[in-house]
Amino acid sequence: MAEFLPPPECPVFEPSWEEFADPFAFIHKIRPIAEQTGICKVRPPPDWQPPFACDVDKLHFTPRIQRLNELEAQTRVKLNFLDQIAKFWELQGCTLKIPHVERKILDLFQLNRLVAEEGGFDVVCKERKWTKIATRMGFAPGKAVGSHIRAHYERILYPYNLFQSGASLLCLQKPDLTSDTKDKEYKPHDIPQRQSVQPSESCPPARRAKRLRAEATNIKTESDSPEVRTHNLRRRMGCAPPKCENEKETYSAVKLAEKREHAGEQERDKAKARSKKPTSAVDLYVCLLCGSGNDEDRLLLCDGCDDSYHTFCLIPPLHDVPKGDWRCPQCLAQECNKPQEAFGFEQAARDYTLRTFGEMADAFKSDYFNMPVHMVPTELVEKEFWRLVSTIEEDVTVEYGADIASKEFGSGFPVRDGKFKVRPEEEEYLDSGWNLNNMPVMEQSVLAHITADICGMKLPWLYVGMCFSSFCWHIEDHWSYSINYLHWGEPKTWYGAPGYAAEQLEDVMKKLAPELFESQPDLLHQLVTIMNPNTLMAHGVPVYRTNQCAGEFVITFPRAYHSGFNQGFNFAEAVNFCTVDWLPLGRQCIEHYRLLSRYCVFSHDEMICKMASKADILDVVVASTVQKDMAIMIDDEKMLREKVQKLGVTDSERVAFELFPDDERQCYKCKTTCFMSAVYCPCKPGLLVCLYHVEDLCSCPTYQYKLGYRYTLEELYPMMNALKMRAESYNEWASNVNEALEAKISNKRSLISFKALIEESELKKFPDNDLLRHLRLVTQDADKCASVAQQLLNGKRQTRYRSGGGKCPNQLTVNELRLFVRQLYALPCVLSQTPLLKDLLDRVEAFQQQSQKLLSEEMPSAAELQELLDVSFDFDVDLPQLAELRVRLEQARWLEDVQMASAEQNSLTLDDMRRLIDSGVGLAPYPAVEKAMAKLQELLTVSEHWDDKARNLIKARPRQSLSSLVVAVKEIEEIPAYLPSGAALKDAVQKAQDWLQEVEALQVGGRVPVLDTLVELVTRGRSIPVHLDYLPRLESLVAEVQAWKECAANTFLCENSPYSLLEVLCPRCDIGTLGLKRKQKKLKEPMPSGKKRSTKLESLSDLERALSESKDTASAMATLGEARLKEMEALRSLRAANEGKVLCSEEDAELKVCVCQKEPAAPMIQCELCRGFFHTGCVSVPHALQGPRVWLCPQCRRSEKPPLEKILPLLASLQRIRVRLPEGDALRYMIERTVNWQHRAQQMLYSGNLKLLQDKVGSGLLYNRWQSTAGPLPETNKVSQTIGAMSFSMPHDWDNRTIYLHSPFSTGQQCIPLHVVSTELDELMMEAQLLQVSLPEIQELYQILFTKQSPSLQAEQKPSVGPSNEKSECCRGKKDGMSYMERKLKRRFERESFCDEKRARVRKMRTPKKKKLKLSHTKDVSSSSRMERERERLLEAQRSSESHLVPSDTSFSEQEDSEDEDAICPAVTCLQPEGEEVDWVQCDGSCNQWFHQVCVGISPEMAEKEDYICASCAGKGSPYRK
């Protein structure tokens, strides 16, 4: 089967609220469009949502059962045919099984039709057309299908066709219909047996099993009662087992057979029982063909009539006794020739409520499509529906709750006095015309004149649908309109054909399914047959479709066939209505019903007469239409009564037919409801006929008939005349209208009287004819004239000057005003505004005369023009002079604007010129305006040229020189206008000149420029769009400074350091805080008076500001020196406070230590600088295997502390740059501070106090307060904090110091309490830790102070200072060979030329002065080469010290040149040798000091061959470098 193609959509209307207010007016409006499609859909306004008024719990109904494939006309014909074939073979004891051909069920109906079309079985066989028939049936050619089809036809269909043709079947051998095991058993539908009268026990709407079965089953169909059940109605599908003789005899004795009487004289539909056979045993066993009773075992007994036949007497003879029921040839013909009964729906056995039906419907749909009901597409349901109705292989049964009376269960719309209580906001739906309870009885509906409550027509019917439940092709009763509203639920799919195609649709269905119409001529009126819209469209029938959703109306028009089905569970309500235009169609429908013998729902003539009896209140149009229809009715009635009278019916009487029930006054022949007249005979009381069928009443003579009439003809004419009078009642009104329209000036009526005539027409509902339309038009014109006149009298001009000077669309010209006044006088009615407008016209004409006089002058003044314009404001009339007056006024004002704009020098901008030119262009030509325009245009051209040129000069790349820009500025200054780009260019030139002056002033001063000044100049110079010669040099200088700062930061700053370079180089300003974001609590010990903790940001910013503001280096050094003093003082106070925490009692709850600011808890570690205590779990501590080291806390560890040789190149490069910056001053001060410290440290080393201090340390005097030994420091997973030069390796006995065990300040490592030994040494070591430079003197001091071993042991322990030696080795850098050799030769020469006197020898030794690590470096020697030589000497000193076992506890630092005459050996353990021959050796490291050879253990040979590096220079590397 081809896929279903949806027909085109019908029109969909969406009325506005105004259109929706009157349903009949709206339907009348859309009728020309919707009639062309038969159906249409109406979507109410969105806010129109009536409440659902049905009682869901109380509404119950019994639905109809619908088997889908029995609804379609062509499918039902096939099923009826197959049922006849099955019945034919069943009566002969065989079961029909439909064969398969090419794995497809053979369509027996199509095969039978095609063979008949080709001429019958004999012709097809003779002409060999079986292959052609197979091809027409869709089988592929060339597979010998034709022979198979012939065999099946000959076996199954040929005997049936012979029987239908009347041939005797006695000679036919019964074929073996059950031999083919592949055939499918056919299950008859028993369609005629399923009537709506007797509902079955249970028939749920579920998908049934396929009709075609592989195995035979015994299926029985129960008849009405067991007493009248017969074998021929049982239609058993399988062969029953043979019955025993006793059972057959008993059954045959009581069996009855139905026999239909065909004689014309007997009454219809009266069945008679077949007369019973004699019960003689001889008669029961006698063959009717041979008359013999012999061979009883071969004697067949008919299951229908109990006649007996020998098997061998039948032609051809039967070899065996049939196993199933067997009918003789007479019974077979009797059963098969019974007329087919009409098809109808049967009622379901179950009663449903809305809830139970909905549950069943949703379950069916979801199970069928295997998805939720709301997810099934409507297109899928539509295609599946038309597939199911067209197949005979699948039975799908559904139920439909149709035609449920709303009178019994209540309408879905709210009604007055109903059980449903509406809310106040819902009361509008009670009286709405779209409420289906109101529409049929509205005044515009002719059904309102029918008093009876006709269900479905005047009273709505309710419809509860489920998926696939359908309504078949039909037209409404009496060809009326219908309207259907879907209250809720899933959509309803509609199909409709227009009314003009109704007969065409009927002809197509009769053509395609003639068998159905033979038994039911009015089949399409039974609502039991559908046909695929595609089939109808293929035969030329126009069909349209739509999906009606919840809240939408569907309207069908007169005689428009429509059908459809439901997409799922829903609830709809429908009713009929008839408009005036339906009346002619209604009479035509009655004639059509008479031909079909169809019952009428109401009497059309009765309705016409009732309307005629109310002629005085009928609408004029309705009265006119009813009068025309009544005229036809009277003519027909007059003709029919004359005909009856000619037939001999003379007796008559008046009968009130409207008092009889409709079924008691129906014509016996055509079923028409009689009202005007009827004929009846005394022989058949209660039986009557209409005047069309008098001859069909009975066989009595016609003079015995009696004519019953409702009205005499004399009574009918006055009724018609009343309608006519009603239709003509507005003649008087029309006369009044004509008189008013044609009245003279003196007799004219007022506008109010005209409106009264219109109101009268509306009140009496006069037809909308030309006269009424003309009256409305005249009245509307007069009303408009009155409104305009009042506006002209009351209104003034809305604006003083209208743009463009054009006419306002609503304004009248003077001529129009003059014509309008004339029109007012010409109106059929009188207006009160007419004389007032005449006065207005006079004043306007006076204004025109004055304007013309003023405009004729050569140059009117602006004041006069304005005064005249002010007068015109009182006239709401378009005056032609106003435009010219405004033009003159605009010209005068424009010239004034030009003069004001040019009054001041350089006040005229480009925008002003453009604005004036733009406004002047719109002015009318005038000499003064044109001259001013020319000047402005010339000035604008020049100004734009120079403005663009100035803009280009500013944006030029590369930038223009200052001299060229100065020339351009001079040119621009000569233009009498303000140029934005010119002003910008002038400003740029001025800025460039100022900038150059500042740069030149900076050069002239001779001072070293400050970095901030340079950065500010560079920033300003980049923003000036002028080529500046000095700018690249300044940018290069700033870039060098930035590069220097980055190099310095890489040298000093630790990785991810929180400190800036300036913070590291300057003296500390944050001493006393832990650098935390939150403010810490003060310790109990008071700070020194006048000292206050300050935040790092404030102090650093103050110091940086002071450095930036300093005029020269000297003032900067002074500032930094002051900061150093504050640093030292603050650190001393902090150390004292931290040391004092040890003496605090354990009960002191406010005592907080460490970065976590919590109470002390062992183990702890103490910072060497600030003497603060820290939990070993809060900070990174050295690993136990690394030995004791000097440890600094995170606050005191600020930089990498590079060695001095790394810092000196930075200072040298800074001097080359010659730019002052705070970081440079800080670096100079740090180096100067370092050198000063070195000098103090050397003095301490050279003095004899160190020996005494070393003895004190060795005797343990410093640790007499420690009482016990602490365990080793617990290991931690944190990385050991080796803080540059601060992580010194301590002697091996450092861990053997005693510490206070029971104190919470028990530490793994504590600081050296030097303040107990020497305040000077404590100050020196404290400042050593503050220095951000690695110095060998620091390590030397620690080694001297804390080494207790003898010199021999010290020499043995020298390798323990491996890191220092290794670092010293690494400190050897590149070395200038020539300078090194020159120094060696010079030293040898000096040693040979020593004089005997020590002083002279020492002076000669010091004559070649060595380089000093001071700020006053000589310029002839570069710092970089000096550092390379010092690095090489360090390496040589290291090798020398390793070979000679130089003691590691001795360290020397470089000393400044002294003018002292006495030479001093810097060795700490100087032996002070006496004599003239004392040998000296000079250190080849960085210090260049002279030592006694005997004091340092060097022989003369070694001094000649090897380089000597003192212990101080050899120790600069490892401990101090990271």
From Swiss-Prot:
GO terms for biological process, alphabetical: chromatin remodeling; regulation of DNA-templated transcription; rhythmic process
Keyword annotations: Biological rhythms, Chromatin regulator, Dioxygenase, Iron, Metal-binding, Nucleus, Oxidoreductase, Repeat, Repressor, Transcription, Transcription regulation, Zinc, Zinc-finger
Enzyme type, top EC level: oxidoreductase
Segments forming PHD-type zinc fingers: 284-334, 1151-1199, 1462-1516
Subcellular locations according to the entry: Nucleus
Zinc fingers (C5HC2), renumbered ranges: 667-719
Annotated GO MF terms: DNA binding; histone binding; histone H3K4 demethylase activity; histone H3K4me/H3K4me2/H3K4me3 demethylase activity; zinc ion binding
Cofactor(s) listed: Fe(2+)
Domain JmjC: 428-594
Basic residues bias spans: 1400-1416
PANTHER family: LYSINE-SPECIFIC DEMETHYLASE, LYSINE-SPECIFIC DEMETHYLASE 5B
Task performed by this protein: Histone demethylase that demethylates 'Lys-4' of histone H3, thereby playing a central role in histone code. Does not demethylate histone H3 'Lys-9' or H3 'Lys-27'. Demethylates trimethylated, dimethylated and monomethylated H3 'Lys-4'. Acts as a transcriptional corepressor. May repress the CLOCK-BMAL1 heterodimer-mediated transcriptional activation of the core clock component PER2.
Family membership noted in the UniProt record: Belongs to the JARID1 histone demethylase family.
Protein name, per record: Lysine-specific demethylase 5B
Originating organism: Gallus gallus (Chicken)
Designated gene of the protein: KDM5B
